[in-house]
Amino acid sequence: LAVCVSLLGAANIPPQHLNLCQFKEMIRYTIPCEKTWLEYTHYGCYCGYGGSGTPVDALDRCCYVHDNCYGDAEKKHKCNPKTQSYSYKLTKRTIICYDAAGTCARIVCDCDRTAALCFGNSEYIGAHKNIDTARYC
């Protein structure tokens, strides 16, 4: 309960060396308190490393869109999304990205922000965790 209550307040997160740590913090902020960010790895066809086929549900679509967003950041903007740090704030149940528009930092932050908010608004279906990707994807 204390964790849930603390997430309702505002939190400033300083830039970190690895974007994936920042993305993890965004996910923690938006998902239900009874879940951990680790439950969102190996979920569906796209949540986790790689991805193929058709997303199995809305949550998996969040990961599909995030993968494509990272792909666009790499190809169109020559960014490295997995290591690009950025400035952001978690406040009032939303996420604000602060870096200048068009910069790699802002592009990657927007990818992560969109995915984290999508996770928070999507149903988690336990049967889609660790699915047989060869069969269902």
Curated annotation (Swiss-Prot):
Its main location: secreted. SUPFAM superfamilies: Phospholipase A2, PLA2. Its EC number is 3.1.1.4. The keyword Lipid metabolism applies. Residues 1-10 form the signal peptide. It is found in: Secreted. Belongs to the phospholipase A2 family. Group I subfamily. D49 sub-subfamily. Heterodimer; disulfide-linked. The A chains have phospholipase A2 activity and the B chains show homology with the basic protease inhibitors. This is Basic phospholipase A2 beta-bungarotoxin A-AL4 chain.
